[in-house]
């Protein structure tokens, strides 16, 4: 194609995530997020808004709000993860689609999908 894509896939989606149509939802989410006392994570978090690693709570919160209506920077995220030479990488959220995609790119990294309560409480995932 003109944009250089090799192939395009239709992904089933229940909401118009990561686009401007979700801006009103992000405002409501901001209200909820502001009522939560977030603690600084013990590891760095890479979010889809800017593809950079941080453990600053304020930045993580701002990015969580923005990622509802802003595009995912998948290639940038994969490049950032590759540069970190990680032994383990976690996908947080429902489903395992992204974990599958990550395994193709991060071949030397163990990819763990944290998509339910059991996966979050299984200590073996974090050793």
What feature does the model see in each segment?
Residues 1-127:
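Acyl-group transfer acyltransferase/transacylase scaffold of fatty acid/polyketide systems
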């Amino acid at each position: 194609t003109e944009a250089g894509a090799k192939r395009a896939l239709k992904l089933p989606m229940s909401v118009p995530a990561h686009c401007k149509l979700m801006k009103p939802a992000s405002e409501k989410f901001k209200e909820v997020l502001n009522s939560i006392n977030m603690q600084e994570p013990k590891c760095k978090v890479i979010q889809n808004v800017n593809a950079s690693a941080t453990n600053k709570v304020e930045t993580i919160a701002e990015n969580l709000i923005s990622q509802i209506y802003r595009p995912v920077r998948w290639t940038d995220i994969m490049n950032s993860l590759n540069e970190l030479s990680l032994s383990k990488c976690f996908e947080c959220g429902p489903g395992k689609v992204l974990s599958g995609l990550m395994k193709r790119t991060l071949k030397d990294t163990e990819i763990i999908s944290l998509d339910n309560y059991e996966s979050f409480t299984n200590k073996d995932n974090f050793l």
